[in-house]
């Protein structure tokens, strides 16, 4: 048995085998195994103020992993986050915990979102935001 502490920062994902390999002696784990066993848990943010939550979500929307998602989510955050209540902000926070490519495919309609996101107002707003900006050249909005 191993613990989270045994997982080193140096890791890589092999797309061919679908196995996460960790540096040193940690065992091989599949991505789904990590999610099922909840080995990677989100940070507890239960004591976060609404102002801090909004600020963090704006930052996380701008600093993703791929440029396409950065451009989409940063514009979306600027336009929608000020209108959202705390409940919707937390839903958006959960969406940001998903992989960048998944978010991109779901909001563009390339792939269907998983069942737990099908009735999401945030994902619906994100799709609406993209469809209303058809043909617009995207750029990172100023803070």
UniProtKB/Swiss-Prot annotation:
Keyword Chaperone carried by entry: yes
A GO CC term assigned to this protein in UniProt: mitochondrial matrix
Sorted UniProt keywords: Chaperone, Mitochondrion
Pfam family, one: Sdh5
GO BP annotations listed: mitochondrial electron transport, succinate to ubiquinone; mitochondrial respiratory chain complex II assembly; protein-FAD linkage; tricarboxylic acid cycle
InterPro entries according to UniProt: SDH (IPR005631), SDH_sf (IPR036714), SDHAF2 (IPR028882)
Compartments it resides in: Mitochondrion matrix
Function noted in UniProt: Plays an essential role in the assembly of succinate dehydrogenase (SDH), an enzyme complex (also referred to as respiratory complex II) that is a component of both the tricarboxylic acid (TCA) cycle and the mitochondrial electron transport chain, and which couples the oxidation of succinate to fumarate with the reduction of ubiquinone (coenzyme Q) to ubiquinol. Required for flavinylation (covalent attachment of FAD) of the flavoprotein subunit of the SDH catalytic dimer.
Assembly notes: Interacts with the flavoprotein subunit within the SDH catalytic dimer.
Similarity-based family: Belongs to the SDHAF2 family.
Further information: This protein may be expected to contain an N-terminal transit peptide but none has been predicted.
Protein name: Succinate dehydrogenase assembly factor 2, mitochondrial
Native organism: Schizosaccharomyces japonicus (strain yFS275 / FY16936)
